[in-house]
């Protein structure tokens, strides 16, 4: 797939191609051998720039690769304590690894690519752990019925990522797309996230009180404590969500 935008969208170059020339000759001849550089470079009716490039070069010499690896696991345990009380515990684990790289060959628009090409490498890993426990109550008292649940949960998200982009800093060797070949100067970029974690702890309750199966009162309450509230005035009380319905 090819990225969008004025730099990398081949349709922009097709629309701007001179009407009096034959675009098809650039389809198979989108590159030509440069004796001075001893390698193939982009072939186009004019000098490639941020405004125009050979659309077939964009298609064949600007390459994106996305891969996702994922693993899921879940576990549920139930216990019927009495005829009117059930206990439940659940847990989920979700691991996601996203890997992306982009290869832009030398002689792509110099506005976005160094003289020897550009390489973008990104590796992101997310790890999610979720667990909850609940007690569920269902009982009749004469004309009254009570259906209620009380529980708590925890949600932990952890992220690690590394993104390297040679940008216009270029590569040491032309068209060699590896991380060690990136010229890591001030024109390049490197971003790393190590164990960025977000935790949400919650308690919740819900109840429905009925009378003769004709009138019902619904009550719910939930309180969340998020790690994003650390060092704020809300760190202890969190967020409270009540509701009442009749």
Predicted ranges, named:
Residues 1-70, 88-201, 228-235:
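Surface-exposed loop/interface segments of Gram-negative outer-membrane beta-barrel transport/assembly proteins
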Residues 71-75, 127-133, 201-207, 223, ...:
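Hydrophobic, lipid-facing positions within transmembrane beta-strands of outer-membrane proteins
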Residues 75, 89, 148-150, 219, ...:
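Membrane-embedded beta-strand positions of outer-membrane beta-barrel proteins
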Residues 75, 79, 209, 213-214:
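Extended, hydrophobic/aromatic-rich amphipathic alpha-helical segments that build helical scaffolds
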Residues 80-82, 140-142, 212:
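Outer-membrane beta-barrel channels and translocator barrels
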Residues 90, 200, 206-210, 217:
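Exposed, low-structure sequence patches enriched in small/polar residues
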């Amino acid at each position: 797939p090819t990225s969008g935008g004025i730099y990398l969208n081949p349709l922009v170059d097709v629309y701007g191609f001179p009407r009096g020339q034959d675009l098809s000759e650039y389809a198979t001849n989108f590159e030509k051998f440069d004796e001075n550089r001893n390698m193939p470079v982009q072939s186009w009716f004019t000098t490639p720039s941020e405004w125009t490039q050979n659309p077939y070069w964009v298609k064949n010499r600007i390459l994106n690769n996305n891969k996702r690896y994922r693993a899921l696991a879940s576990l549920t345990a139930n216990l019927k304590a009495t005829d009117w009380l059930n206990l439940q515990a659940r847990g989920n684990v979700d691991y996601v690894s996203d890997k992306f790289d982009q290869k832009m060959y030398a002689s792509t628009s110099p506005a976005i690519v160094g003289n020897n090409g550009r390489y973008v490498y990104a590796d992101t890993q997310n790890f999610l752990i979720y667990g909850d426990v609940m007690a569920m109550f269902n009982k009749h008292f004469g004309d009254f019925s009570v259906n209620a649940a009380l529980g708590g949960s925890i949600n932990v998200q952890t992220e690690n990522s590394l993104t390297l982009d040679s940008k216009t800093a270029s590569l040491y060797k032309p068209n060699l797309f590896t991380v060690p070949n990136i010229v890591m100067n001030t024109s390049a970029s490197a971003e790393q996230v190590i164990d960025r974690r977000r935790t949400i702890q919650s308690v919740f309750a819900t109840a429905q009180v009925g009378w003769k199966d004709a009138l019902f009162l619904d009550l719910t309450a939930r309180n969340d404590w998020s790690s994003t509230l650390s060092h704020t005035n809300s760190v202890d009380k969190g967020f409270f969500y009540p509701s009442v319905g009749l």
